[in-house]
């Protein structure tokens, strides 16, 4: 199972002010062509900087587990927090729009927790840019502006492993990314609930790939990407 897991953080003395879930990207995560869904998350930090992140359902489960492990004396208090319920709501969502909204609610819950937790190394590390985010980011984007465009299917773009000329964005998949390929991450039995199981993506695997990329366009401010093959 691929993920955006990494250790350590360079975001000391900073915290997340807000986050929005823009959509879902389905990426190839192994040489066998296995695909996994990643939520595309826009985060705004205390210094007004903006990061675009990609996290899987398994990453969300690990975040909640690591919070409990990092504060063993507060396990009972963290158990009362609506984190587990949020994960179950995401896993049980029957459509993509509901799933995106539930992911956003869970992340808002995390960053709204007392500073002891929301500004802990565990949370800051989760929201730090990962090697996967480095590959998918667009360095030419400097500002956010409203963008109302139709959903874009990108599964075929990912399979092409190269440049996209569909006038939406340029994507390059680098198979040398650490923690990718066929490497499996260690997880104990309690974490299996949060793994991205087959039933989690069954509605996307049936039929003709209804939407490999779906965005929440009702009120989000998205980044319009421009494609330039010469970049």
UniProtKB/Swiss-Prot annotation:
Signal peptide: none
Source organism, top-level taxon: Eukaryota
Gene Ontology MF: a single term: phosphatidylinositol binding
Disulfide cysteine pairs (residue numbers): none
Domain PX: 1-134
PANTHER family tied to this protein: PX DOMAIN-CONTAINING PROTEIN 1
Descriptive protein name: PX domain-containing protein 1
């Amino acid at each position: 199972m691929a993920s955006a897991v990494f250790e350590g953080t360079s975001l000391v003395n900073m915290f997340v002010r807000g986050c929005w879930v823009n959509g879902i990207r389905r990426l190839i995560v192994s040489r066998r062509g296995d695909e996994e869904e990643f939520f595309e998350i826009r985060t705004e930090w205390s210094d007004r900087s903006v990061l675009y992140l990609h996290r899987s359902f398994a990453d969300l489960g690990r975040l909640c587990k690591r919070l409990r492990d990092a504060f063993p004396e507060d396990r009972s208090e963290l158990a009362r927090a609506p984190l587990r319920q949020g994960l179950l709501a995401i896993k049980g969502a029957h459509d993509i729009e509901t799933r995106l909204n539930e992911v956003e609610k869970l992340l808002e819950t995390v960053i709204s927790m007392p500073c002891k937790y929301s500004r802990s190394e565990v949370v800051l590390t989760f929201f730090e840019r990962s090697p996967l985010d480095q590959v998918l980011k667009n360095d030419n984007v400097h500002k956010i502006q409203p963008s109302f465009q139709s959903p874009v299917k990108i599964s075929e773009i990912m399979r092409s492993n190269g440049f996209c000329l569909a006038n939406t964005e340029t994507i390059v998949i680098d198979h040398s990314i650490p923690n990718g390929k066929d490497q499996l991450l260690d997880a104990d039995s309690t974490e299996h609930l949060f793994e991205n199981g087959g039933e989690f993506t069954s509605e996307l695997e049936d039929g003709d790939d209804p939407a490999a990329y779906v965005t929440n366009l009702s009120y989000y401010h998205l980044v319009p990407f421009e494609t330039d093959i010469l970049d």
